[in-house]
Amino acid sequence: MCAQYCISFADVEKAHINIRDSIHLTPVLTSSILNQLTGRNLFFKCELFQKTGSFKIRGALNAVRSLVPDALERKPKAVVTHSSGNHGQALTYAAKLEGIPAYIVVPQTAPDCKKLAIQAYGASIVYCEPSDESRENVAKRVTEETEGIMVHPNQEPAVIAGQGTIALEVLNQVPLVDALVVPVGGGGMLAGIAITVKALKPSVKVYAAEPSNADDCYQSKLKGKLMPNLYPPETIADGVKSSIGLNTWPIIRDLVDDIFTVTEDEIKCATQLVWERMKLLIEPTAGVGVAAVLSQHFQTVSPEVKNICIVLSGGNVDLTSSITWVKQAERPASYQSVSV
């Protein structure tokens, strides 16, 4: 694997050994209705059943156990990160396992359910403005004040390696998989999965899915250079509002086969479709990948790409806010054959 990348497949293997005793082997489920809609065999990697309700515990726990080894005589005074919710919950849980305080910098606009969960796990919350710049600046200040270690939610190599363990499981659970579809925000999960898949089964496609309102990954691939979102994106998929970064971009640039963008209505309808037809309470961020596979654009993918695994990234749903958009979205034409 190219030396310019921040991690190698060996790092993913180490992460798997590092965390496997403390995480769930999440199931892969299927849906005959969604298969009919797409004309493909869909498999759903259910990270909503993971500890803390999302895939984020994989990277967070690997980071804490890698950056704070037991061999150290003096543990750091804290771990710090910025997060819209899921990474914050995961890092707090991981830090608690290792007996370390956690400080989480959270955008003021983060869903209440995620903020309350972070507090319930025992973290101290510090609020920031909903922009990448504010997140970074406040987190840096808190790290200095607490004499802690910063664990970036998607650019820390140990986090990226931890997220890559998803692909290790998928390739075992679905041996004939032709492609993985992964929602992308900062790109940690996408990069980790891409490194793993291309190391073990280079012929398997890795597709990214992101909201059209937060399409920095798509724009970066299109223009061949890093193109972060200029303004805080407005999307219901709060977990993918971050832009890809310097560590995830080279991997995504070289190893991700294609990127599919989806509208807010497509995300809402796909999320609701999974709720009602699969009985899985996914969050809208997890619905982004489903929306991508159901989109008109995805129909251009070769029919030889038959067996597709979609990573359902999490299930930390703000039920109160969901009431305001359920049933209100205009259903895309591709959904017309299913009554939702």
UniProtKB/Swiss-Prot annotation:
It comes from Homo sapiens. ATP binds at residues 31-33, 51-52, 89, 121, 279, 316. The modification S-nitrosocysteine is found at residue 113. The keyword Isomerase applies. Mg(2+) 2 binds at residue 178. Pfam families: PALP (PF00291). Its cofactor is Mg(2+); Mn(2+); Ca(2+); pyridoxal 5'-phosphate. Keywords: Allosteric enzyme, ATP-binding, Isomerase, Lyase, Magnesium, Metal-binding, Nucleotide-binding, Pyridoxal phosphate, S-nitrosylation. S-nitrosylated, leading to decrease the enzyme activity. Mg(2+) 4 binds at residue 247. Pyridoxal 5'-phosphate binds at residues 86, 154, 185-189, 313. This is Serine racemase. Catalyzes the synthesis of D-serine from L-serine. D-serine is a key coagonist with glutamate at NMDA receptors. Has dehydratase activity towards both L-serine and D-serine. The keyword Nucleotide-binding applies. GO terms for molecular function: ATP binding; calcium ion binding; D-serine ammonia-lyase activity; glycine binding; identical protein binding; L-serine ammonia-lyase activity; magnesium ion binding; PDZ domain binding. Ca(2+) 4 binds at residue 247.
